[in-house]
Amino acid sequence: MKSNPKENKLYYGKGDVFAYRTYAKPLTGISHIPESMFTGRHNIILGANIKVKIGGKAFEPSFVEGENSLVIATDSMKNFIQRHLAYYEGSTLEGFSEYVSKAFFETYSHIDYVSIIAEEIPFTVVSEVSDGSLKASDLVFKKSRNERSRSSMEMIRMDDALILSEQSSSIMDLQLIKVSGSSFEDFVEKELEDSNRPLYIYLNIHWIYKEQSDAFGETPRKYVAAEQVVDLVTSIFHNTETTSIQYLLYEIGCMMLRRFPQ
């Protein structure tokens, strides 16, 4: 059996690949949780900031000899990713990450390792008035500066088989403030404590699936939507008397495992 291609550490890539797609397949049929009214994504616009790395033993001459006959230009990587987002028939960033990773392997036979990190570029609905009534626009969207979902994936080629070696989903840069109900007591500097104070938190939350294929969204009832995770976290933050950040994180982790057994 060949050694793990990632262990060779011969890889390079490109970041800030901005890709946008309109009218992707909607995400529907996800499982309901009590803390969230989220039922799916229309995916009228799907945007992502993507970082890609590719590697393999075949790239060694480019590193040690400057011989570039097998090197894939980073601008070509960008075009490849943007084109395949247009071809993608699924509804999630995780599914696209798998799809484009496999496409790299199928197109370039000398690649042994692909890493894709795809961060959502979120857009929110705006309202418009037509026929005298106020409603959500299905043509105009506003870029959000709030939290964003992320898909991280590594795939390797071993003995002519493609293996998904790592996969995780995330919500990044979630910022919340609770104006009361947070008490930090029994610490060393007691005179500096306040039994009821506002608490502003920044959170990055990551999760993995028991079955990696559930991450792609092809079976929606087994897919964990980042929007549901946000709603779950805000509900826990509201209902928990926060005695420490550690306790809050513990409660969030436990409830995520209960609500999403997959």
Describe the residue ranges of each PLM region.
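N-terminal intrinsically disordered, cationic/polar leader segments
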Residues: M1-Q262
